[in-house]
Amino acid sequence: MEHVPGSFGTSASFALRFGQTIFSAASLIFMCFDFDFYDFTTFCYLAMVMAIVTPWSILLALTDTYSVLVKLLPQELRVLSIVFAGDFVLSFLSLGGACAVASATELLASADGKICDGSLCIQYQVSAALAFLCWFLLLASALFNFWSLPSLYY
């Protein structure tokens, strides 16, 4: 089997997973700095998605680490299909959450500052920006794994 750079079990995949873990955890931390995010559904949605993406990325980063160090992880069609499907679904969930939080924060900030003070809106904007970065890395992982799927059929 030919390894595509960035596909599951490579060092480039580990780098993508490490970035996903950092960005999703940071987005979750910035979202949870304030307890008022429970008042808005979009903020709860992003916190929930990032709470799912973080362990997913950690688990796959550990698997990539094992694969790179031991060089013993076999590439199976079923495993790679599950990883691709998980990355693909989570990438669009995180894109939806990031877009929703970015638009809700902009709406709250434009309401004359009555609802969202300066530092709180900045925290939400940083959380949305980190979620966008996490989405980009998740989509890149999904595309690299999708690219390597056909080589497992032969």
UniProtKB/Swiss-Prot annotation:
Keywords: Cell membrane, Membrane, Transmembrane, Transmembrane helix. Coiled coil: none annotated. Residues 1-17, 63-81, 150-154 are cytoplasmic. Residues 39-41, 103-128 are extracellular. It is found in: Cell membrane. Homodimer and heterodimers. Belongs to the Casparian strip membrane proteins (CASP) family. This is CASP-like protein 5C2.
